[in-house]
């Protein structure tokens, strides 16, 4: 819920390499008017797994840090993350998660931040 991207692992199992993602993200952030946009479906495994998760698995490799992600896009909308507080980042990401998973994400949000969503 913070905006970091894990694109090479499922759990602790590596499924791909980084490719050019890090270079592309850094280039976008360094260019005049550039923005990083992470576009993805909100779910995986035929809708059984949310791709927006409250925590990454311990030991999973972060491909792109939360500081480098400007926008995350799913079929449910756009979350603008740049310049947002951790609470606002989490709210924005929950807002673009698949509706079937939002309740669970909100529960974790409320536990973590000790406040109502």
Task: Label each residue range with its predicted role.
Residues 1-117:
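Conserved phosphate- and dinucleotide-binding cores of soluble alpha/beta proteins
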